[in-house]
Amino acid sequence: CEFLAQQTERRNQRAQLIAERLEKAQIPGALEGAQRLAQGGAVTRGHFARFLVECGKASSMADVFKKYLARGKTGYVPPQWCTIEQSIDVIHHSGGKAVLAHPGRYNLSAKWLKRLVAHFAEHHGDAMEVAQCQQSPNERTQLATLARQHHLWASQGSDFHQPCPWIELGRKLWLPAGVEGVWQLWEQPQNTTEREL
Protein backbone atom coordinates (compact mmCIF):
# COMPACT_ATOMS: atom_id res chain seq x y z
CA CYS A 1 0.00 0.00 0.00
CA GLU A 2 1.44 3.34 -1.07
CA PHE A 3 0.02 5.04 2.02
CA LEU A 4 1.87 2.72 4.41
CA ALA A 5 5.08 3.12 2.42
CA GLN A 6 4.76 6.91 2.81
CA GLN A 7 4.18 6.59 6.56
CA THR A 8 7.18 4.27 6.87
CA GLU A 9 9.35 6.74 4.97
CA ARG A 10 8.20 9.58 7.25
CA ARG A 11 9.12 7.51 10.31
CA ASN A 12 12.52 6.66 8.82
CA GLN A 13 13.21 10.33 8.05
CA ARG A 14 12.23 11.30 11.58
CA ALA A 15 14.55 8.65 13.04
CA GLN A 16 17.40 9.95 10.86
CA LEU A 17 16.78 13.54 12.02
CA ILE A 18 16.65 12.49 15.69
CA ALA A 19 19.96 10.67 15.26
CA GLU A 20 21.54 13.71 13.58
CA ARG A 21 20.42 15.97 16.41
CA LEU A 22 21.78 13.54 19.02
CA GLU A 23 25.06 13.29 17.08
CA LYS A 24 25.41 17.09 17.29
CA ALA A 25 24.87 16.73 21.05
CA GLN A 26 27.91 14.40 21.21
CA ILE A 27 25.88 11.17 21.25
CA PRO A 28 27.18 9.11 18.32
CA GLY A 29 25.67 5.87 17.01
CA ALA A 30 22.12 6.58 18.11
CA LEU A 31 20.47 5.51 14.86
CA GLU A 32 22.37 2.24 14.73
CA GLY A 33 21.60 1.58 18.39
CA ALA A 34 17.91 2.35 17.95
CA GLN A 35 17.75 0.17 14.82
CA ARG A 36 19.36 -2.71 16.71
CA LEU A 37 16.74 -2.40 19.45
CA ALA A 38 13.91 -2.15 16.90
CA GLN A 39 14.99 -5.56 15.54
CA GLY A 40 13.95 -4.77 11.99
CA GLY A 41 10.77 -2.92 12.96
CA ALA A 42 10.00 0.77 12.79
CA VAL A 43 12.40 2.88 14.85
CA THR A 44 10.56 4.98 17.43
CA ARG A 45 11.55 7.45 20.13
CA GLY A 46 11.20 4.53 22.53
CA HIS A 47 14.10 2.76 20.81
CA PHE A 48 16.25 5.89 21.02
CA ALA A 49 15.32 6.18 24.70
CA ARG A 50 16.33 2.59 25.42
CA PHE A 51 19.62 3.16 23.58
CA LEU A 52 20.35 6.31 25.62
CA VAL A 53 19.67 4.46 28.88
CA GLU A 54 21.99 1.64 27.72
CA CYS A 55 24.71 4.24 26.99
CA GLY A 56 24.34 5.76 30.44
CA LYS A 57 23.09 9.11 29.12
CA ALA A 58 20.02 8.86 31.38
CA SER A 59 18.91 6.76 34.32
CA SER A 60 15.48 5.79 32.98
CA MET A 61 13.20 6.06 29.98
CA ALA A 62 11.35 8.94 31.64
CA ASP A 63 14.68 10.69 32.24
CA VAL A 64 15.61 10.32 28.55
CA PHE A 65 12.40 12.01 27.44
CA LYS A 66 12.88 14.85 29.95
CA LYS A 67 16.48 15.44 28.87
CA TYR A 68 16.52 14.60 25.15
CA LEU A 69 13.32 13.56 23.38
CA ALA A 70 10.45 15.75 24.62
CA ARG A 71 9.28 18.82 22.71
CA GLY A 72 11.93 21.54 22.93
CA LYS A 73 14.77 19.16 23.80
CA THR A 74 17.89 18.34 21.78
CA GLY A 75 16.62 15.17 20.12
CA TYR A 76 13.02 16.20 19.54
CA VAL A 77 11.75 16.09 15.98
CA PRO A 78 8.02 16.64 15.46
CA PRO A 79 6.19 13.73 13.83
CA GLN A 80 4.76 14.11 10.33
CA TRP A 81 1.49 12.22 10.48
CA CYS A 82 -1.20 11.73 7.91
CA THR A 83 -4.54 13.49 8.32
CA ILE A 84 -7.45 12.04 10.25
CA GLU A 85 -9.37 11.75 6.99
CA GLN A 86 -6.54 9.79 5.33
CA SER A 87 -6.13 7.40 8.22
CA ILE A 88 -9.88 6.70 8.52
CA ASP A 89 -10.10 6.08 4.77
CA VAL A 90 -7.16 3.64 4.73
CA ILE A 91 -8.43 1.78 7.80
CA HIS A 92 -11.91 1.41 6.33
CA HIS A 93 -10.56 0.29 2.94
CA SER A 94 -8.55 -2.35 4.80
CA GLY A 95 -11.70 -3.64 6.52
CA GLY A 96 -10.87 -2.20 9.93
CA LYS A 97 -12.58 0.07 12.42
CA ALA A 98 -11.04 3.52 12.91
CA VAL A 99 -10.45 4.27 16.60
CA LEU A 100 -9.26 7.61 17.98
CA ALA A 101 -6.43 6.57 20.30
CA HIS A 102 -6.04 7.99 23.82
CA PRO A 103 -7.66 11.41 23.21
CA GLY A 104 -7.25 12.29 26.88
CA ARG A 105 -3.46 12.27 26.55
CA TYR A 106 -3.10 15.03 23.97
CA ASN A 107 -3.14 17.84 26.56
CA LEU A 108 -6.02 19.56 24.80
CA SER A 109 -8.39 21.98 26.46
CA ALA A 110 -11.98 20.76 26.81
CA LYS A 111 -12.93 22.93 23.83
CA TRP A 112 -10.23 21.45 21.55
CA LEU A 113 -10.93 17.91 22.74
CA LYS A 114 -14.58 18.36 21.75
CA ARG A 115 -13.49 19.69 18.36
CA LEU A 116 -11.15 16.75 17.80
CA VAL A 117 -13.83 14.18 18.60
CA ALA A 118 -16.41 16.02 16.47
CA HIS A 119 -13.98 16.18 13.53
CA PHE A 120 -13.18 12.47 13.88
CA ALA A 121 -16.89 11.56 14.00
CA GLU A 122 -17.76 13.84 11.05
CA HIS A 123 -15.23 11.94 8.93
CA HIS A 124 -16.81 8.59 9.83
CA GLY A 125 -14.50 7.45 12.61
CA ASP A 126 -15.96 4.42 14.37
CA ALA A 127 -14.81 4.55 17.98
CA MET A 128 -12.67 6.38 20.49
CA GLU A 129 -10.55 5.19 23.38
CA VAL A 130 -12.54 5.90 26.52
CA ALA A 131 -10.76 3.80 29.16
CA GLN A 132 -7.02 3.96 29.82
CA CYS A 133 -4.88 2.90 32.74
CA GLN A 134 -3.71 5.70 35.05
CA GLN A 135 -6.80 7.75 34.21
CA SER A 136 -8.97 9.80 36.51
CA PRO A 137 -12.62 8.73 36.80
CA ASN A 138 -13.62 12.26 35.73
CA GLU A 139 -11.65 11.99 32.47
CA ARG A 140 -13.18 8.58 31.73
CA THR A 141 -16.67 9.97 32.30
CA GLN A 142 -15.91 12.99 30.08
CA LEU A 143 -14.64 10.76 27.25
CA ALA A 144 -17.65 8.45 27.55
CA THR A 145 -19.95 11.47 27.30
CA LEU A 146 -18.17 12.63 24.13
CA ALA A 147 -18.42 9.13 22.65
CA ARG A 148 -22.18 9.06 23.32
CA GLN A 149 -22.72 12.57 21.95
CA HIS A 150 -20.97 11.67 18.70
CA HIS A 151 -22.39 8.15 18.39
CA LEU A 152 -18.97 6.53 18.65
CA TRP A 153 -18.20 3.09 20.01
CA ALA A 154 -15.73 2.86 22.89
CA SER A 155 -12.37 1.15 23.24
CA GLN A 156 -9.94 0.47 26.06
CA GLY A 157 -6.17 0.73 25.95
CA SER A 158 -2.92 1.01 27.84
CA ASP A 159 -0.75 2.83 25.24
CA PHE A 160 1.83 0.09 25.86
CA HIS A 161 5.05 0.47 23.88
CA GLN A 162 7.53 -1.27 26.17
CA PRO A 163 7.61 -2.52 29.77
CA CYS A 164 7.51 0.30 32.30
CA PRO A 165 6.35 0.57 35.92
CA TRP A 166 3.47 3.01 35.35
CA ILE A 167 1.51 0.93 32.81
CA GLU A 168 -0.61 -1.89 34.15
CA LEU A 169 -1.73 -3.95 31.17
CA GLY A 170 -5.40 -4.83 31.29
CA ARG A 171 -6.03 -3.33 34.73
CA LYS A 172 -8.65 -0.73 35.59
CA LEU A 173 -10.02 -0.61 32.04
CA TRP A 174 -13.76 -0.73 32.72
CA LEU A 175 -16.13 1.17 30.43
CA PRO A 176 -18.69 3.57 31.90
CA ALA A 177 -22.37 2.82 31.46
CA GLY A 178 -23.92 4.00 28.23
CA VAL A 179 -21.05 3.21 25.86
CA GLU A 180 -20.53 -0.01 23.94
CA GLY A 181 -17.21 -1.69 23.18
CA VAL A 182 -16.05 -1.48 19.57
CA TRP A 183 -15.17 -5.17 19.66
CA GLN A 184 -18.89 -5.89 19.37
CA LEU A 185 -18.56 -4.84 15.71
CA TRP A 186 -15.94 -7.48 14.97
CA GLU A 187 -16.89 -10.66 13.22
CA GLN A 188 -16.83 -13.53 15.66
CA PRO A 189 -15.23 -16.75 14.42
CA GLN A 190 -17.59 -19.68 14.42
CA ASN A 191 -16.57 -22.62 16.52
CA THR A 192 -16.05 -25.98 14.85
CA THR A 193 -19.37 -27.41 16.04
CA GLU A 194 -21.38 -24.56 14.46
CA ARG A 195 -19.55 -24.90 11.12
CA GLU A 196 -20.19 -28.63 10.95
CA LEU A 197 -23.96 -28.24 11.45
Which ranges hold each PLM region?
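Charged catalytic cores and adjacent phosphate/nucleic-acid-binding surfaces used
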Residues: 4-7, 59, 82, 86-100, ...
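Extended substrate/RNA-proximal surfaces in nucleic-acid metabolism proteins
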Residues: 1-118, 180
